[in-house]
């Protein structure tokens, strides 16, 4: 059970036996606490590999070696008022939010290699500020829009169910593998040529076609209570989403860095896919959750919606043999 503080009183969060949300007990906190890192002096390349740094981004990133990261994935606080485990972020004007981004973005650009790529997440409200800041330092290559599947209804506005991810690179020579992120889709109206399937395959489970990934993703499931990757982090990204970014923009063994690590999804997914990882997170509880998930990834490298070297549509577990 997870301890919850409500009006100064410790209470236990009661979960259903079917709830697979990852949480911590006191024994696990003691077990994983020694794995968390801090930085007080310049770090070597080896000292940032496969590490979780528990601290404020401004205090830690200045000690990272320059040009040390192959791929950076950033999921910063959006321009919304939200409580991240006791660390509150307050919504502000568009100009003030842009200034917030500009206060730390130059610091993280310093650690990117000359051939590195970067992805940064946002919603409709902050995406313009993200583009402006990123474009001042890097070359913006594309914008990915992904459908959250979840989303609260609205009476006086459109339901907000999509988010953006800006893709940028340091220079013109960057790594990108389109074949690594192909999607296996059902064929609704199969076309045949001379009686044979054209551009699709017929299997015992149905008719499927491998398609190249576009910049609109409608196959992502946001983590929820029945998924073991789920945590109590209020803005957790799906492992499947991060897996697409990692597979497309890094080689095996590359270093993937997340300066707003949260409960560890980027590091965990990088480890599952054979990459090195590093993250910075100021909330200790989230860092400990990340370490628990990383330990579990030693024996469980599965990623929901990704199997057989391809990404699958939602609700295809039977076809995947799961």
Q: What is the meaning of each model-derived region?
A:
Residues 1-289:
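Core catalytic lobe of class I
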Residues 288-322:
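PRPP-dependent phosphoribosyltransferase catalytic core
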